[in-house]
Structure formats: C-alpha cells, structure tokens
Amino acid sequence: IFKKLISKKRNYLKRNISPQEYQKIIELGEINIQTEIEKKRIFPYQNVGSHIVGYVDVDNQGIAGSERAFNTELNNGNDIYLTIDIMLQNAVSNELTDIVNKFSAESGAVIIMDIKNSEILSLNNYPDFNPNNLNNSNAEDRLNRALQSNYEMGSTFKPLTAANGFDYDIIKCAE
C-alpha cells in the first residue's frame, strides 16, 4: 500500500466504499488520500429482465444488453424507456424457472411479442443473473440464449410454411 501511496500514478485503494468506511477515513485525520464521488447504476429489479437490461463494468460502461446499446445516453444522464412490461416479465420469469426445474433442463428462453406492432413485451432466460452483483454469476448465466444461441428450426418452421400455403391458395381450410 505504501508504494501505491508514494507513486505519482493514480491508484485506487478501494472503490465503492460505504458511508461507514468513508467516515473511518475522515476520522484518521489529515492524510494524503483523495476521495471521489462516482455514479453507480443500480438495478432495482435485480434478476428480473437482467438479459434485457444488461450490465456495466466498474467504470459504468455498458457491457451487454440495453446498458451497452444506450451507453452514451445513460452516461449523459438521459432516461430510456423500454417496451418491457415488468409485471409480465416477472410472471414469465417465474414460469420459466418452474418449467426448467420441472423438466430438469439446463437452460431455457422465452420471448413474448405484441403481434400488432412487434414490440418485445418480455424476454427471459434461465439461468439469469443479478446485474448488481456480477461476482455471483458466470458467463453462462449472462448468455442471452433468446438472442445469442443457435437452435435447429425443426417443426417451428411448419406454421410459416402452412401460412404461406394459405396465402397462395395452395392449401384450403377444408384440407
């Protein structure tokens, strides 16, 4: 620590200290330590919607999700508004967790869209993570499976083929 203190280089002894820790430093008297107030983004919904919201690094730079997509706006103090319905997001998150556990699956993903305007109303992944505490998660938890994983289309493409058949009168309702 002494080498860091006498160095001309700026060094952090500790970042994001609590008010109690700050008070203890003040009580030490006159010492050559500078304190600096830093902004910190707080994620009030914790794990709910974590893959949509994303996360930031120690310097509040967006690394993933909306935090990355809107990093400049957020760092400039602007608000952003998403189409996500937090009540729906929470309900789907709980259902997804139950289904994954019921079938002993390793992971799962759900996307719910408004068919009238294509807005994303809910996007969930399991496992998820708490962006307030990235130390308790790993890369697998932070992977947005709904958008970043590869899946074989299989039978999910059949409704599109059928719809196309109806559009071109190849398939009739009676068939």
Predicted stretch roles:
Residues 4-78, 82:
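Small/polar-residue-rich segments within soluble enzyme cores
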Residues 35, 53, 66, 124, ...:
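Long, contiguous hydrophobic alpha-helical segments, chiefly transmembrane helices and signal peptides
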Residues 38, 113, 121-124:
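Basic, glycine-enriched DNA-binding surface that flanks or lies within the catalytic cores of DNA
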Residues 46, 64, 121-126, 133, ...:
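Short, solvent-exposed loop/turn and secondary-structure capping segments
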Residues 56-59, 122-128:
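Short beta->alpha transition motifs characteristic of CBS
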Residues 76-115, 131-175:
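Active-site loop and adjoining helix of the penicillin-binding protein/serine DD-peptidase-beta-lactamase fold
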